[in-house]
Structure formats: C-alpha cells, structure tokens
Amino acid sequence: MRGTPLLLVSLFALLQPGDCRLANAEEKLMDDLLNKTRYNNLIRPATSSSQLISIRLELSLSQLISVNEREQIMTTSIWLKQEWTDYRLAWNSSCYEGVNILRIPAKRVWLPDIVLYNNADGTYEVSVYTNVIVRSNGSIQWLPPAIYKSACKIEVKHFPFDQQNCTLKFRSWTYDHTEIDMVLKSPTAIMDDFTPSGEWDIVALPGRRTVNPQDPSYVDVTYDFIIKRKPLFYTINLIIPCVLITSLAILVFYLPSDCGEKMTLCISVLLALTFFLLLISKIVPPTSLDIPLIGKYLLFTMVLVTFSIVTTVCVLNVHHRSPSTHTMASWVKECFLHKLPTFLFMKRPGLEVSPARVPHSSQLHLTTAEATSTSALGPSSPSNLYGNSMYFVNPVPATPKSAVSSHTAGLPRDARLRSSGRFRQDLQEALEGVSFIAQHLESDDRDQSVIEDWKFVAMVVDRLFLWVFVIVCILGTMGLFLPPLFQIHAPSKGL
C-alpha cells in the first residue's frame, strides 16, 4: 500500500508528452547556468584578466525613417546583431535531453554594453532588450531592434541633387580595446528586410573598424550610410516653378514699352523669387559653409531679374526721348538703326510719304519770289499772276486768259492796275501763310521722324537684351544643374 502513490507518480511522468520533459530540461538547464554561485552577469566572460573578448557585429537595416536636413539628424530602424562567447554558459547537451539552444533574457547575462556614440537624442542603448540565444558551446547571439537618431552632417552644396554620407558609430561604453575587440562580421550592412524609402535611395552601406593611432585602446565600428536623394519632389515643387517664374522675366523684353506694365512684371517676378528663396531657407540647415544648389539658382535668377529691371528703365528712357530733350548721335543711328537690326532679325517698316501731300517750303518761297519779280518787271494782268502761281496754291487749273481778259476789258486802266496790285499783295500774304504752314508741318514731320527713330532704338535695345537674357539664362541653368546630375560620389574610406 505504501508503494502505490510512488507507482502512480511514475506512471504519470511516463505518460507526459516529450515537450513537457523538454521544458523541464530547459528550466533545469537555465537554473544550472544562471546559478548565482557560478554566474555573475557583471563580470566579463574571460578566463584571465588579459584575455580579449571578441565581439562580432553585424548591422541589418530595416528602414530609413527620415533625414532632417535642418536639424541634421538621421532616423533609422536597425537590428544590431552581436555575437560573442561566454564559456560559463556552455553545457553538455546530452545531460539535458539534447537541448542545444537556450533563450535567456538579455539582462540576466553579461552584455558588452555597445552603444551608439553619435546619437542625437540622448538614447545610447537599444530600446528593447530581447532574449539572447545561447548555444551549448557557449556562443551567444543577440539581435536587439532599435530606432536610432544619429547626428548627420548635411552637405547642402548640391541640394536637391545631393548625396549624403551619414554614419553610425558603435563602441563599448565601459570596455576598451584591451578588454574587448570589436570586429565586423560582414563588410557591409544587411538589407534583406529593408523597406524602401520614398525620399532616399541607398547607394552603399559599408562598415569599417576604426582604431585610433594616438590611442590604441580606442576601437569602434562605423557604418557609412551613403544615401542619394530622390529629387522628384523638389523638382516638381521648387525647381520647375522657379524656372517658369524666371521665364516670365523673358516676357518683360517682349512687352511693348507703351503698355506701361514692364516694371510691374519685373517687380512681380522678383517678389516671387524672393518668396522661394525664403522657402528654401526653412528647409536646408542654417550653415555658412556652403550655398545649396537651388539657392544658387534662385540668386542667379534674382540677379537676372534685377538686370532686367535696370535694362527696362534704360529702354523706357530711350523710348520716351524727343528732339526737344535729346539729340541722336551719328553712331547711335549707324549702330541701332542700320547694323544691329540686321543681326537681331528685325526689319523696320518703310515710311511712305506722299510728295503731293503738301508743297515744299522752298517751292513756296520760289513762287512768291517769282510773283514779286514779275510785278517788278512790269505791269501784268491778274491772268499772268494766276498763270504763275495758282498751280502751286490750288490744284484746280487756272482760269484761261481769254476769260480773265474779257472780264477786265471793260474796266479803266487805272482801276485795272489798282485791282491787280491789291490782288498781288493779297496773294503774296496768302503764299507766305501757306509757306509758314508748310514749314510747320515739315518741322513736325522731322520731329515725329526723330521720335520714331528713338522708339525703334528702344525696340532694338529691348531685343538685344532679350537675346542676352535668354542665352545667359539657358547657359546658367545648364551650368548649375548638369554637373550635379552627372557627378559620381565616392564613398568614404575607412582608416
């Protein structure tokens, strides 16, 4: 009767599944390994004080979360795989029912306290202490996930076609090179589980082991994150609007001077470019070491628009000149009225002036003189006077002599002489009045011709500056944006 309970317990143990026995074996193994009498997680796992513990590191990139250009911080989600050997955690698997792998909480074993040295938020260690994987030969593998914010020096020279080299520097916080040795398990970071970024392309992720020649006890492992920006976002939202706004400045030279809106268009374009320049200053870091590429382009276009404002003032000044204020020099006529229009593909419409529109003043003077000389040579009838002068005053043919003679034949001689004298005097005064009007019209024609010449000079200057602006704008844009597109960035070499 006394052996019955013991027999029942033995039968119950035999009927249990194998995993329960295995769980009991793992529990017993953990109790044996982590017994406080034989294991202290604060002591380095070395058989002697001079023994060097080798820590093998391997970084696996999960996600490039963001790169804050203004604060110069890179945020990444990584897994930092660490491997080392702890002889105190080795066991004979045959004594524990073939258990070869044991998972132990990380805080219960010795850790090499490897931290991110160049962190930017004060978080040096990992955020989650996952279990370590311990094998029967004493090798330990720890793969903790972490979200790191690391300091990254942003090079703004080619923004937004830039390529950055941000680093993650890992080092033990309390142990130096005489106690632990950090080595790379692979020359580059692992990207098997990487989630692509919408803003950056990963160019390369080389790792290097750095030893300070001045301090042999210093050693660290550094991973270079060589990333290249995807410029589509900034091209659509910054570069193309800037180019379109700059192209509006070209219309300033094509706009007629008489419309009065040339200066308004120039100032509007300049204000728009100033707004974009202020927008850029909110994105890039406030550094004085270099000027971003988009900033250089905006400054370049602002200089061009300022130049267009100056040229517009000059063109308007030339356009509104007149003979009463300025005299056109001969070289100006030769250069801007004859030579430059040919090279600028400009053709001035010809001025068609009808010769019968108004008699020339010299002809009127000649007619008056002839009329006076005729009266001085001898008495003449009004018919002779008509025949000599009416052709110039009135296009209607003069009255024939026979009609005039028959009209005056019945008058006395003295009356005829007095009548012809008064008629000659009235006719002379009329001719002098017509001569004055002709001279005035001729003077107005000359002044108007000079004014039209000044306006054409202004058009030539406007067209000249138009070609200069277009050529400089195209060459400047290509010179600024083409080199960064074809530039090859070499990754940093380790020491």
UniProtKB/Swiss-Prot annotation:
Its main location: membrane. Residues 1-20 form the signal peptide. Residues 257-264, 319-463 are cytoplasmic. One of its GO terms (cellular component) is plasma membrane. It is found in: Synaptic cell membrane; Cell membrane. Activated by a myriad of ligands such as acetylcholine, cytisine, nicotine, choline and epibatidine. The heteropentamer CHRNA3:CHRNB4 activity is blocked by the alpha-conotoxin ImI and AuIB. Component of neuronal acetylcholine receptors (nAChRs) that function as pentameric, ligand-gated cation channels with high calcium permeability among other activities. nAChRs are excitatory neurotrasnmitter receptors formed by a collection of nAChR subunits known to mediate synaptic transmission in the nervous system and the neuromuscular junction. Each nAchR subunit confers differential attributes to channel properties, including activation, deactivation and desensitization kinetics, pH sensitivity, cation permeability, and binding to allosteric modulators. PANTHER family: NEUROTRANSMITTER GATED ION CHANNEL. This is Neuronal acetylcholine receptor subunit beta-4. It comes from Mus musculus. The lineage of its organism: Eukaryota, Metazoa, Chordata, Craniata, Vertebrata.
